[in-house]
């Protein structure tokens, strides 16, 4: 039986002074409880925070697993939101005949903690995924049994489950690092279909074309040849599952980072041809890191800080 019951208590958002600025927006959703049977329940919290400066939104769902048959506290963190591509076209100031396209080669998503009483016990997605559409499920059975299924339609009956689903056309997801205190993913450009066939994301001439006009935009392929992750941005959907030693500290802090690494492609016309230069990771780690505090007893979530402000 599942019931969605709105909590009467108001969640403290923790709007400390450094967050009160015009470049940051914070909101929260209603808090809910889901009964998953045998006296166990999921206490759900949601936090939204937007950095207007970097055009990044974190929508984070915190699902506390309250299960007397499991000897630890558990928390499922689903990381959603939006990371704008910030693709731009411009003339170089000192050399206006050189046109530049800045575009996201990689999107960054990570979670980490320094709490010695907290361990990362599961995460999605795992391994390397190169399919355009990604969909996976995390399931929980009473007693502390977390499992992952290969897809939303995967087999298995769970007391509680959480799914991820996102599109990464022309990109590939890789786990860059993982240990008991965190995990870091990179969603990286892979290959692109062009009028001249399949082209590697590392190709020097990628996206450049013979100019159709004098503007910087005219030196690069039109929007209908660019995937959504370059035209607009990326909607992440990632999950981490964390355990906490019961009775060892009421609060823990987690840092969640979203961002992008930007490549720069330069194009200009010489006497005889179009010349193209490429700088990989020209603007790296254009990230936003939000520090969250969770209370294992009251199941409250607070935003402690955001970097950069």
Curated annotation (Swiss-Prot):
InterPro entries: Bi-component_toxin_staph, Leukocidin/Hemolysin_toxin, Leukocidin/porin_MspA_sf. Residues 1-29 form the signal peptide. Keywords: Cytolysis, Hemolysis, Secreted, Signal, Toxin, Virulence. One of its GO terms (cellular component) is extracellular region. Its main location: secreted. NCBIfam families: hlyII. Belongs to the aerolysin family. Toxicity requires sequential binding and synergistic association of a class S and a class F component which form heterooligomeric complexes. HlgA (class S) associates with HlgB (class F) thus forming an AB toxin in strains producing both gamma-hemolysins and leukocidins. HlgA and LukF-PV can also form a complex. One of its GO terms (molecular function) is toxin activity. This is Gamma-hemolysin component A. Toxin that seems to act by forming pores in the membrane of the cell. Has a hemolytic and a leucotoxic activity. GO terms for biological process: cytolysis in another organism. It is found in: Secreted. It comes from Staphylococcus aureus. The keyword Secreted applies.
């Amino acid at each position: 039986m599942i019931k969605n019951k709105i909590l009467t208590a108001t969640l403290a958002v923790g709007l400390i002074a450094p967050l009160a600025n015009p470049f940051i927006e914070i909101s929260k959703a209603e808090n809910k409880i889901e009964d998953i049977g045998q006296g166990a329940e999921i206490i759900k919290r949601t936090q939204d925070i937007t950095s207007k400066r970097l055009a990044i939104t974190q929508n984070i769902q915190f699902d506390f697993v309250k299960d007397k048959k499991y000897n630890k506290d558990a928390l499922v963190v689903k990381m959603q939101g939006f990371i704008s591509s910030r693709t731009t076209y411009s003339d170089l100031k000192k050399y206006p005949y050189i046109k530049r396209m800045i575009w996201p080669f990689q999107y960054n998503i990570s979670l980490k903690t320094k709490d010695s009483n907290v361990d990362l016990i599961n995460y999605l997605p795992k391994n390397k995924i190169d399919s355009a559409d990604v969909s996976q499920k995390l399931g929980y059975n009473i007693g502390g049994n977390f499992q992952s299924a290969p897809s939303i339609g995967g087999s298995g009956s769970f007391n509680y489950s959480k799914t991820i689903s996102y599109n990464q056309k022309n990109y590939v997801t890789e786990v860059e690092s993982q240990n008991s205190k965190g995990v870091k993913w990179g969603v990286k450009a892979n290959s692109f279909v062009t009028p001249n066939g399949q082209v590697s994301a590392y190709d020097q001439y990628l996206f450049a074309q013979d100019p159709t006009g004098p503007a910087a935009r005219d030196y690069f392929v039109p929007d209908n040849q660019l995937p959504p992750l370059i035209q607009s941005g990326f909607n992440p959907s990632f999950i981490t599952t964390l355990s906490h030693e019961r009775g060892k500290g009421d609060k823990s802090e987690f840092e969640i980072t979203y961002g992008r690494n930007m490549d720069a492609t330069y194009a200009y016309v010489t006497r005889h041809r179009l010349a193209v230069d490429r700088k990989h990771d020209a603007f790296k780690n254009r990230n936003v890191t939000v520090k969250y505090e969770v209370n294992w007893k009251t199941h409250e979530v607070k935003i402690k800080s955001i970097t950069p402000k």
